[in-house]
Amino acid sequence: MRLDKFDLAILKALQDDARASLNDIGAAVGLSATPCWNRIKRMEREGVIRGYTADISPEALGFMDTVIVHVTLESHSDATLYEFGRALAEIPEVLEAFLVSGDYDYIIRIAVRDTRDYERLLRERLYRIPGIRHSKSGFVLRSLKQSRLPLSVVAPAA
């Protein structure tokens, strides 16, 4: 989908505040509410906008630690990769999982309450997934940057 300067401005406004009113978005991008609404609906239909979420503080809900886990599998068969991905999808604490190139097969981001909670998750969930050869974990000490898509570097369609 080709996005013009108005589409990109709408996306930026929604990234900044997905709860902004159509009037506020229109004022920010230089359009009235109806054209904004039509553009938003088109971007939703075409999959540019995948949904709207709330940015919830993990700490406010007791998830005090984030763990980054690197996993190497025994096999790289389609069946093994599929089964590992399916098993990860069933673990609620897994926030993100990436199949990657390099020394490891997967990088996983996990939210846990504390080290005991992580140890429990390892024993009861992660290490019960068949096919894991090796894993390496690191606790995040501090998050240095969390950001959204860099819309400022996207060139608008003419």
Predicted regions mapped to residue ranges:
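A compositional/biophysical signature of low hydrophobicity enriched in polar/charged and small residues
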Residues: 1-158
